[in-house]
A protein has these predicted regions:
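Terminal targeting signals and extreme-terminal segments of soluble enzymes
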Residues: 1-141
Length: 141
């Protein structure tokens, strides 16, 4: 990694300004050599009609943390990241509290990054398991 952990978390927070991530109150909280962790509050703003965490909000959290994590491995002055495929298995429901997304790299190629994102609750129960594929493109491509 080119930056220290605090600078990486500040950079990730800045990326969220005026975006869906800010709307969903996604906050990046931990970073390591091969992972990034974010959290999102579960409240009526992210519910589906039955009062449960919406799968789309969960997927938005997963793609956000996986895409931000890919930025850790590239020169952001020369390259940018785009999500090209995401899948999710929703395993447990959640009504309120906080969910955590931990993105861990599975494959780090020159142009393709594959991430596994585990969405867990405060007790580390697995809520959803997601897979994200990102492509690394030259800027202005």
């Amino acid at each position: 990694m080119k930056l220290n952990k605090e600078k990486i978390l500040q950079f990730s927070k800045k990326l969220s300004e005026n975006t869906l991530m800010e709307t969903l109150n996604i906050e990046y909280i931990e970073v390591g050599e091969d992972y990034l962790v974010a959290k999102m509050p579960v409240n009526p703003k992210v519910h589906q009609p039955m009062g449960l965490l919406h799968g789309g909000a969960t997927v938005a959290l997963a793609e956000s943390v996986g895409s931000a994590a890919s930025l850790l491995f590239i020169d952001t002055d020369k390259f940018e990241v785009r999500g090209i495929e995401i899948s999710a298995n929703h395993l447990k429901s959640k009504r309120e509290g906080v969910v955590y997304a931990t993105a861990k790299i599975i494959h780090k190629g020159k142009t393709i990054h594959l991430w596994q994102i585990k969405i867990t609750d405060e007790e580390d129960n697995l809520i959803s398991l997601c897979k994200l594929t990102n492509i690394v493109l030259p800027k202005n491509a």
